[in-house]
Amino acid sequence: MESVAYILILTLAIGVLFFAIAFREPPRIEKKEEK
């Protein structure tokens, strides 16, 4: 049962990290399109 909690916390951490990166990526992608 402990592994389930660890996986949940890990997934949540990765999800938040991915969300933060995905939100900071779009602006840079727009600049790349200009090139």
UniProtKB/Swiss-Prot annotation:
Pfam annotation, one family: PsbT
Membrane topology recorded in Swiss-Prot or TrEMBL: Single-pass membrane protein
Record-linked SUPFAM superfamilies: Photosystem II reaction center protein T, PsbT
Alphabetized UniProt keyword annotations: Membrane, Photosynthesis, Photosystem II, Thylakoid, Transmembrane, Transmembrane helix
An annotated GO cellular component: plasma membrane-derived thylakoid membrane
GO biological process assignments: photosynthesis
Superkingdom of the source species: Bacteria
Transmembrane segments: 3-23
Keyword Magnesium: no
Function: Found at the monomer-monomer interface of the photosystem II (PS II) dimer, plays a role in assembly and dimerization of PSII. PSII is a light-driven water plastoquinone oxidoreductase, using light energy to abstract electrons from H(2)O, generating a proton gradient subsequently used for ATP formation.
Summary of subunit composition and partner proteins: PSII is composed of 1 copy each of membrane proteins PsbA, PsbB, PsbC, PsbD, PsbE, PsbF, PsbH, PsbI, PsbJ, PsbK, PsbL, PsbM, PsbT, PsbX, PsbY, PsbZ, Psb30/Ycf12, peripheral proteins PsbO, CyanoQ (PsbQ), PsbU, PsbV and a large number of cofactors. It forms dimeric complexes.
Name of the protein: Photosystem II reaction center protein T
Organism expressing this protein natively: Nostoc sp. (strain PCC 7120 / SAG 25.82 / UTEX 2576)
Gene name of the record: psbT
